[in-house]
């Protein structure tokens, strides 16, 4: 199936996108030597609600990644409709590019990955790539217990990303600056949107 295309899928709520997401994108492109990184904002997440509507989050992503070589922002999950399960997105882009894509998640996802819809299929149909978010030992131990062999999972060697969208929304709500937390292209708009 693999045609030589090295494709990464980076999904998330991006509510809002922050500098940590941008760092993950840059390091992922470099470390995995990707031909293309597809950033996919979730449309209808199965386990949590988003604050900002899809259109707003999609618009912010487009602004931030505009001009960044090899990055594409996709509205696939909106077009597909229904609940946004990652396996459907993986299968879709796998078929489009005729390759087994890399699927990028934060290391906190390892603590509940077995609860993801068709998680075994995700592991079979993509190469799981994990970026650091905290000191990851407990997550790795849990994943080892539940998933078994982790040798097929790629753990990115990059700085730990500790910024969270939840923290950003809270900062905006109480009127604190988001300088350094979100890209400058969208900072003022994000401050106003989530502000009290």
UniProtKB/Swiss-Prot annotation:
GO terms, biological process: NAD biosynthetic process
Reaction(s) catalysed by this chain's protein: nicotinate beta-D-ribonucleotide + ATP + H(+) = deamido-NAD(+) + diphosphate
Enzyme class: transferase
Protein origin, superkingdom: Bacteria
Keywords tagged on the record: ATP-binding, NAD, Nucleotide-binding, Nucleotidyltransferase, Pyridine nucleotide biosynthesis, Transferase
Entry's Gene Ontology molecular function annotations: ATP binding; nicotinate-nucleotide adenylyltransferase activity
InterPro entries: Cyt_trans-like, NadD/NMNAT, Rossmann-like_a/b/a_fold
PANTHER family reported in the protein's UniProt record: NICOTINATE-NUCLEOTIDE ADENYLYLTRANSFERASE-RELATED, PHOSPHOPANTETHEINE ADENYLYLTRANSFERASE
Protein name: Probable nicotinate-nucleotide adenylyltransferase
Gene source species: Thermotoga petrophila (strain ATCC BAA-488 / DSM 13995 / JCM 10881 / RKU-1)
Gene: nadD
């Amino acid at each position: 199936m693999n045609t030589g295309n090295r494709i990464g899928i980076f999904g998330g709520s991006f509510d809002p996108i922050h500098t940590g997401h941008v760092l993950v994108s840059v390091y992922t492109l470099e470390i995995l030597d990707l031909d293309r990184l597809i950033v996919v904002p979730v449309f209808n997440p199965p386990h949590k609600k988003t604050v900002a509507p899809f259109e707003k989050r999609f618009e912010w992503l487009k602004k931030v990644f505009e001009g960044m070589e090899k990055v594409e922002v996709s509205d696939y999950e909106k077009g597909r409709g229904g609940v946004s399960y990652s396996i459907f997105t993986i299968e879709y882009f796998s078929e489009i590019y005729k390759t087994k894509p890399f699927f990028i998640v934060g290391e906190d996802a390892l603590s509940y990955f077995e609860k993801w819809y068709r998680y075994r299929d995700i592991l079979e149909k993509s190469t799981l790539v994990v970026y650091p978010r905290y000191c990851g030992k407990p997550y790795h131990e849990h994943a080892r217990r539940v998933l078994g062999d982790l040798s097929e999972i790629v753990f990115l060697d990059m700085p730990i990303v500790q910024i969270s969208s939840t923290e950003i929304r809270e900062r905006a709500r109480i009127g604190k600056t988001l300088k350094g937390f979100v890209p400058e292209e969208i900072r003022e708009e994000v401050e106003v949107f989530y502000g009290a």
